[in-house]
Every structure is written in C-alpha cells, then in structure tokens.
Amino acid sequence: KRNTRAYEFQKGPANQKSFGCIAATHKNLSGKDAAATKMAAKGTCVMALMTGEQYVESMRKLNLQVYMFGKKIENPVDDPILRPSLNSVKATYDLAQDPEYADLMTAKSILTGETINRFTHIHQSTDDLIKKVKMQRLCGQKTAACFQRCVGMDAFNAVYSTTYETDEKYGTHYHENFKKFLQYVQEHDYTVDGAMTDPKGDRSLPPHLQADPDLYLRVVERRPDGIVVRGAKAHQTGFVNSHEVIVMPTQAMGEDDKDYAVAFAVPTDAKGIFMIVGRQSCDTRKLEGSEIDVGNSQFGGTEALVIFDDVFVPNDRIFLNGENEFAGVLVERFAGYHR
C-alpha cells in the first residue's frame, strides 16, 4: 500500500509534474460527474480537484498507524466511529465540485494558475479572506461538524510568509521548499493537517529544561540529506483523515531551544508516525445499532495524539531548522489567521 506514496515522498515535490488542465469530458468524468462537466463548460479547470469519493479512495491507499481504545485500527476509512469524521472532510471535496459553490470553495493557484480547492490557497486579498470565512461557514452549515481543514489552510499562509523572511535573513531555501510542497499538494488536491500543539509538560519551563526532552517535538539528528525528529503533537484535529502534515513550533523559542525551532512536512503515513485517537462524546453509541444519543451520525470530528518516533524529514521538506527567532513569528502569524 505504501509503495506509491513512499516513492513520491522520496522523489520530492520538485519532480512532480503538473496535472495540467484536461477537458472534463474525459472518459473518466463523462457521464459520471455531471457537476464537474458543468464547471468545465464554464471554462473552469477541474481536473486537479478530486471528488469526494476519490478522496475517500485515496485515504484507503495510506498505511496509517491508528490506535483507538487500546487497539490498532486496521481500516480507519470504514471504522464506524471514525467514518463520520472522514465524511466531514469528504464534504469539502463534494462542495468544491458543485458549481453553486465553486466561487467560495475554489480559487486560482498563485503557483500554477490552475483551479484549486480554497483550503490549499494562499490568500492574496481582502476578498480572499472574506471568501475563506464564507467557505468555512458554508462547510459548517452543510456538516454541522468540524471539517478539519482549517488548521492546514492557516498553516499554509503562515509558513508561506515566514519562510520568505527567514530566507531573506539567512539565505536558506525554505521558501522555495515550501512552494514546491504546496504545488505538490495543490496538484494532488491533498488534505493537509497542521500540527502545532506539543504536550509541553511543565509550562513554567522552556523545552530544553523539561524532565523529558521529548515533551516538545525536536530535531534529534541532522544528516546531509535531512533531519530526524522525535516528540509528539497533541489534539490533532483531522490528522487521521489527512494525506500530509505540516509541523510547526508551538511557541517562541530561545537560543537554548534551537532544536525545537523546527517546521516541516511529511506524509501522514511516514515511518515512525503513530496516532492515538481520543474519545468523542457518545462515540460508542454508534456501535449499538440505535439512533438514540448518537449525536450527528453522518458527520463529525476526530482528534489524536500523534507520536513522531524518530521520523526522517528530507531537506526539501524542511521549512525551519534552528532559526529560533522565527519560531515565535510563525506561531503569532498562524494565530492571526486561525483565531
């Protein structure tokens, strides 16, 4: 199951070719996706956009290490407790295919000029920000649940500008790394989780003075071809339903915490990543065969404690690596978008 994804990850986004814009009357869409055909008739490129069902099938291909109630979940996509949360993300793909909502749910990529899901867009104007809010409101109205893509979207925009400023000061290549990663995400129409919150431990102490040095995610090895990271990210909304994750520092970092000032992206099924799913209200009611007290039976959310057990990150997926003064900048910028 991992062969294709692992190969793409090792090659890196720089070698991925653009899907381009192919007519939506292609045999794979003709007669099967009327909404996409209508959008194509209006001159809108839809070939880079997955349908909801295509998103679901793409998640089946991942080799996710998911644990819940003390057991490994072999099939997260069809698990009755997890499936409503997957349906919420699926709705963001279905709505993007609907001509009625195309103006809110899609945007033109600043990297390729092609039509993309707005959840992967870099805001360019006040109008973009207004449409972002209206899109989020629409998704909330359609699902009455958490649709799990907001953190990733806000991470894109925070990392985009922060990497540019870091490169200006240090001559690094983080901004180019990020743009290539973002183009890869847009062309594949992937869902990306944003991971910021660490377990933290004693909050009166900085990361390097914690009793356990891994209570904040950190770099434990620097190699010629990349870095190795260890630690965890807590309360990760939608990680189980994402293709990729952007990891960011959780707070401003001092000189002694350079190893904790790290930002990067990896596939959610990268070797060494483990997800421990937390409880939801009334979640086991879904297993009782009754509609009583199941809450929102069709849609939902999910959170997980995500463990990074010596995960390798190649150089072209690194967006911050020890430049500690930009950790706080990134966190503050993200908060401005997110809150």
Where are the model-predicted features located?
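A short core secondary-structure module
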Residues: 232, 236-287
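Glycine-rich, mobile lid/loop segments that gate access to catalytic sites or pores
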Residues: 163-228, 232-239, 244, 255-257
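Aromatic (phenylalanine/tyrosine) cluster motif
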Residues: 7-9, 19
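Acidic/polar, glycine-rich intrinsically disordered N-terminal extensions of enzymes
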Residues: 47-109
